[in-house]
């Protein structure tokens, strides 16, 4: 019995350390997948790249990172549900951003940009985040 009481703190510590490692690793994998998808999308010469989208990056400075990811995900969802172009790539990007945001939100910004500019800005943000991960 004495050995069991000594092992409990060690096991708890190992579980905590493992969960932190896995969480950080998941962050890397998700970001890599997002950046890869954004590289593919921004390299395409497609008429859909000129579609007008809500510029969620023009939101107030006090907007959290999760809110920005959530809004970007909402914009992407609107695009691939109403247009047939690049549907699988945009839906995958939406899914990954949604998992990082882990919340629901609405988009109310009036400022617009093109899909290409939106994706380029998102790629820059994700590369910055990846460099810190």
Curated annotation (Swiss-Prot):
Disulfide bonds join 27-133, 48-85, 70-105. GO terms for biological process: B cell activation; cell surface receptor signaling pathway via JAK-STAT; immune response; interleukin-4-mediated signaling pathway; macrophage activation; myeloid dendritic cell differentiation; negative regulation of cellular response to transforming growth factor beta stimulus; negative regulation of complement-dependent cytotoxicity. The keyword Acetylation does not apply. Residues 1-24 form the signal peptide. InterPro entries: 4_helix_cytokine-like_core, IL-4, IL-4/IL-13, IL-4/IL-13_CS. One of its GO terms (molecular function) is cytokine activity. GO terms for cellular component: extracellular space. Pfam families: IL4. Keywords: B-cell activation, Cytokine, Disulfide bond, Glycoprotein, Growth factor, Secreted, Signal. The keyword Secreted applies. Glycans are attached at residue 62. It is found in: Secreted. Participates in at least several B-cell activation processes as well as of other cell types. It is a costimulator of DNA-synthesis. It induces the expression of class II MHC molecules on resting B-cells. It enhances both secretion and cell surface expression of IgE and IgG1. It also regulates the expression of the low affinity Fc receptor for IgE (CD23) on both lymphocytes and monocytes. Positively regulates IL31RA expression in macrophages. Stimulates autophagy in dendritic cells by interfering with mTORC1 signaling and through the induction of RUFY4. Belongs to the IL-4/IL-13 family. This is Interleukin-4. It comes from Sus scrofa. The lineage of its organism: Eukaryota, Metazoa, Chordata, Craniata, Vertebrata.
